[in-house]
A protein has these predicted regions:
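Active-site groove signature of glycoside hydrolases
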Residues: 88-89, 93, 97-99, 113-182, ...
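Aromatic-rich peripheral "rim/lid" segments of glycoside hydrolase catalytic domains that contact
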Residues: 309-312, 322, 333-414
Length: 538
């Protein structure tokens, strides 16, 4: 992709980052970031050499004010903008038809608002879940591209194609869809055409794209175990810009190395030295003659994990250094394999996010944004970590006095963790004489802490510190959510009913489920449930 410079148009690889709409402690619709936040973040992006920032929706005026101020002050290395526009997803999912007036008209209104925002020529009234204010900062000179849409829901795509079957291909002034295009593809072409018409009316033309992801990619994946992850396709090769739109059109994808499962079950990928790169080359080959950008990629940090990926590129359980190294490797893959750019997900941790294997236990869901769950991987993608840095750990109140070599126990907490400070008679004594701390979290007993003769029978969670520098978190077996959710309810994991009796006296280590049993049809093979221990700390 090329961008205008003082010397004319110049092609380059665009390395950038995605920026969300809010800050920890807030839901996305609250768009809580301030001008000071944006000033700091954009300056830090510039220091890192970020060439592009992608946003998903309209942000507060202060974002565009900060971006324009930075770019005016750095004409030799401005940060370009990819502006996203969300589809009215609730209306689309409820109607199952992108052509429904509530969806199409609502999306056009969002696009029109976004165009006015980018050109600094609109005022948006207050509306729940949306940014508002007076937009007077024109950032159009630094607009690299428009990216409209969302990660398309498979069922709603399939429903749209069924309900609108027989629709002719779209023929607009600026964008068209090919003969044989699906109704969903033609609808996307019409929305791109509408976006282009608004920009053309202002005398502008720039690259346009729509959001896509591996679930609706145009390739066939017979080794994908979940039918819904390969049920429908949306193919950017069926959409084209006309000569009336010199800004052009490109394909874009959210592409992660750990999901869907075809990335590690397809022999062509699984047996390769770098499965992610082989997939990227297959996808790039399909889009021959068309520019393609990876607009989301990355791996999260934290102690939780939600899915396994080839080469250890799992969805979680990485240190900051490990994640950074993997992200850098993938960015090199993206560049080497002929893509126009790669946008890392994401700039800042987002606490409101959820992960499939923990969200049932994060109750009430509307309070998820108020605290950080170390086991929820979607909260840990940020290039900038949004954590409390353990400041509360240094204080706390005394909750237990002298006992068995421990002088006192202090407890404190913050939005991240519960902190315990144990003061020992002999510093480091736990390395040779392990200490067990019990917690009474819920009603009921479990016959005493593990490794004791009935000490603290009310405890249902135990933390064993030592020997050495290891630690082990244990839970009463009858409180194990995995056993109840995936053993009793679904029979995905083995379990002993006697252990699940309240007060059974059995202890086990907390686990997360990473995959349910999966059938790979070409192999006629069922892969068993995948679990990971999250209670052992070496």
């Amino acid at each position: 992709m090329e961008a205008a410079t003082a010397d004319g148009f110049r092609p380059r690889f665009w390395g950038g980052v995605n920026l969300g709409s809010t800050t920890p402690g807030h839901l996305p619709g609250e768009v809580a970031a301030t001008r000071a936040d944006y000033n700091r973040w954009i300056w830090e992006m510039g220091r890192l050499g970020v060439s592009t920032v992608r946003v998903y929706t309209i942000l507060r005026p202060s974002f565009y004010d900060a971006l324009r101020a930075y770019d005016l002050g750095h004409p030799d290395r401005p940060i370009r903008l990819i502006q996203g526009v969300w589809i009215p997803e609730d209306e689309w999912l409820s109607t199952g038809d992108a052509y429904a007036p509530a969806v199409t008209n609502g999306f056009k209104a969002e696009i029109a608002d976004a165009v006015g925002v980018v050109h600094g020529s609109t005022d948006l009234p207050e509306r729940p879940g949306h940014a508002s204010g007076s937009y007077r900062s024109n950032v159009a000179p630094w607009l690299l591209a428009w990216s409209i849409g969302v990660e398309w829901d498979q069922k709603a795509v399939k429903s749209t194609d069924r309900l609108e079957a027989g629709r002719p291909a779209f023929r607009g002034r600026y964008f068209t869809s090919a003969e044989g295009s699906t109704p969903m593809e033609s609808w996307i072409a019409s929305m791109l055409d509408y976006t282009a018409s608004l920009e053309a009316g202002r005398g502008w033309s720039m690259p346009l794209t729509f959001t896509n992801w591996l679930t609706t990619d145009p390739l066939a994946h017979p080794y994908e175990p979940l039918h819904r992850e390969d049920a429908v396709s949306i193919d950017a090769m069926h959409i084209a810009a006309t000569q009336a739109w010199p800004g052009g059109f490109f394909a874009s994808y959210h592409a992660y190395p750990y999901y869907p499962d075809f990335l590690r079950r397809t022999p062509r990928y699984a047996n390769a030295a770098d499965p992610y790169s082989v997939y990227l080359r297959d996808l790039r080959r399909h889009h021959r003659g068309q520019a393609v950008m990876i607009t989301e990629f990355g791996v999260p940090t934290g102690i939780g994990v939600a899915h396994r990926g080839p080469l250890g590129r799992d969805q979680g359980a990485h240190t900051e250094l490990e994640a950074g190294s993997m992200d850098a490797d993938m960015l090199r893959d993206i560049r080497r394999d002929g893509y126009a750019g790669g946008m890392l997900f994401e700039w800042l941790d987002e606490w409101f996010k959820f992960t499939w294997n923990t969200w049932d236990l994060e109750q009430p869901a509307e309070r998820r944004a108020l605290w950080r769950n170390a086991l929820t991987t979607e909260e840990q993608f940020g290039l900038i970590a949004a954590d409390t840095r353990g400041q509360a750990a240094s204080g706390g109140r005394v909750i237990a006095g002298a006992d068995a070599g421990v002088q006192e126990v202090r407890a404190s907490h913050d939005e991240d963790y519960l902190y315990l400070r144990l003061r020992f008679d002999r510093p480091g004594s736990w390395r040779s004489s392990p200490v067990t701390v019990g917690f009474d979290v819920r009603p009921g007993e479990n016959r005493g802490l593990p490794g004791t003769r009935g000490a603290d029978p009310a405890a249902d969670v135990a933390l064993r510190i030592g020997s050495g520098d290891s630690a082990q978190l244990l839970q009463a077996a009858w409180t194990d959510p995995i056993a109840w959710q995936y053993g009793i309810a679904r029979r995905f994991v083995p379990m002993h009913r006697a252990h699940l009796e309240q007060g059974s006296g059995v202890w086990d280590s907390p686990r997360l489920i990473l995959n349910r049993p999966t059938l790979i049809r070409p192999e006629h093979r069922v892969y068993p449930t995948e679990l990971v221990d999250v209670g052992t700390f070496p």
